[in-house]
Curated annotation (Swiss-Prot):
Gene3D superfamilies: 2.30.30.30, Nucleic acid-binding proteins, Ribosomal protein L2, domain 3. Keywords: Ribonucleoprotein, Ribosomal protein, RNA-binding, rRNA-binding. Pfam families: Ribosomal_L2 (PF00181), Ribosomal_L2_C (PF03947). One of its GO terms (cellular component) is cytosolic large ribosomal subunit. Residues 225-239 have a biased composition (Basic residues). One of its GO terms (biological process) is cytoplasmic translation. Belongs to the universal ribosomal protein uL2 family. Part of the 50S ribosomal subunit. Forms a bridge to the 30S subunit in the 70S ribosome. This is Large ribosomal subunit protein uL2. It comes from Desulfurococcus amylolyticus (strain DSM 18924 / JCM 16383 / VKM B-2413 / 1221n). One of the primary rRNA binding proteins. Required for association of the 30S and 50S subunits to form the 70S ribosome, for tRNA binding and peptide bond formation. It has been suggested to have peptidyltransferase activity; this is somewhat controversial. Makes several contacts with the 16S rRNA in the 70S ribosome. Residues 202-239 are annotated as: Disordered. GO terms for molecular function: rRNA binding; structural constituent of ribosome.
Amino acid sequence: MGKRIIPQRRGKASPVFKTPDHIHVAPARYPLLDPSKTYKAVVEDLVHDPGRWVPLAQVKLETGLVFYVPAVEGMYAGQIIEIGPGAKPVNGNILPVGMIPEGMQVVNIEKRPGDGGKFVRASGTYAVIVGRAGGKTQVQLPSGRVIEVPNESRAMIGVIAGGGRLEKPLLKAGAAYYKWSAKSRVWPKVRGVAMNAAFHPHGGGSHQHVGRPSTVARNTPPGRKVGHIAARRTGRRKG
């Protein structure tokens, strides 16, 4: 009798597949503030969040409110930052994209005013303000794609910290194990053709091959629904 394949185990949501959110620090987003006022705040600390690749900055407003945002390069504990339309466009300050000069590097950009930040939050990334038209600001994302967001959407000046993360080699499998363990992802990722027949529909045989068409129907039952699911076509394009 066959065993449950990994997608079936993931659907059951055992602890291996659950995010350990009890060790996460806090959501990283801008607080809801009066958009007409400019606030001063202090960076109290830079903290590590096991659920992220990016360090978080613990920021305390002059009103006493504490929140967390992804830290930018050059940010330090004790730094005074400004938040609002009257803030200067310098590293670490948060202000509406409509107030940021063209050509500046920005991160953690709001898709809609007040959502806390949706774009450009990964380590070492930044976007560039490229232009404005009709109440919207054009921003070039790290992928090269240009998007438009309302002028009232907020962003932070700078480059997300942790950009050298991928430069350090893991060197051994144990390091990769602990790396992905903190993110609650299954590692290592084993190919189906490398498994025994009892553990995957593509497993078994004297050499690694699928042994049957890898395309399956949309309504295929769990345990068999692997490979190219409801594929219109597979293989190399011809002509």
